[in-house]
Structures are given as C-alpha cells and as structure tokens.
Amino acid sequence: HQFLKRYKSTVPTVIIGNITAGGTGKTPFVIWLANHLLNKGKKVGIISSGYKASLEIPTLVTGSSNPSLVGDEAVLIAKKTNCEVVSCGNRVEATKFITKTRFFDILIHDDGMQHYKLARDYEVVLINNKKLFGNGLLLPAGPLRELKSKLDTVDIVAYTNNNTKPY
C-alpha cells in the first residue's frame, strides 16, 4: 500500500479495525478507548464510516441524529461518549471536515483498517477469539479481508469476546 497517495492529518490518527468480515466489537472498543482517553484529559474526535447511512457528505453526529442518515454506529458512539463524531464513508473528507475548525489531541477511526488513502499513526486490529480466522482464506472464499501477515505490521492486536476487562 506504499504506492497510494495518502492524506496525512495534522492530528495523530488511530485506526480501529479488523482483518476478518463480521463483528469483532470495533464500535464498543472505540467507545471504550474514547472514554479512556477523555478521562486522561485528551480531546478526542471520532470518524465513523456511516455504514448503512444515506448521507454521503461529512456530517456531525449527535445522540439524537437520525441513524438512517448517519448510521446507527455513529449515533451510538455519540450517545456513549462526549466526543465530536463525524459520519462519512470518505474518511479523508471526514478527517478534513472534523479538523477544519476544531482542535483534537487524537482522532479515532471506527472500522478504518482497509481505507488506505488515509495515513495512520497507530493501527489496532481486533480479533474475535471465538472465530479467529475461520478457514484462513480471503473473501469471498473465507472471512479474511486481508492476509494474516497484516498483523505483523500493526501496533496492537486485541482479542475480543473473551469476557475480560477493561474492554
């Protein structure tokens, strides 16, 4: 992915994602991480992909936003955190939008692992420890969005669905 021209935000960017299709708990992890950073005194901005959203432009999300317009995950994040949340499938435009008139110590992108047009400072991959990598094959033959070797390049690998705290 080195050949792609990437947009680099002036704000440190954390990507939360996975390498498999299906749920790994990315949104709950984003909520936990955002609240943890807020408790440490950090100003956090969050970008959500707006999955199943009808709006295609960067949109500021509140807890009372219409989920059909901005995506249900974005509304949930806005309700569960005291962060500014922007919903948009175009992560570069969403990043530009949220940082244009606001200051943040850190940006968190929910489900942004495969969006390589956006440079990232940190990558966190979540793995469902009950499903792991399925049959080990890439989509559509298996559940992998990327090769398992991606795990060698990320900053943190966290296993979910194991009933441990803090997440």
Language-model-derived ranges and their functions:
Residues 2-63:
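Walker A (P-loop) phosphate-binding motif
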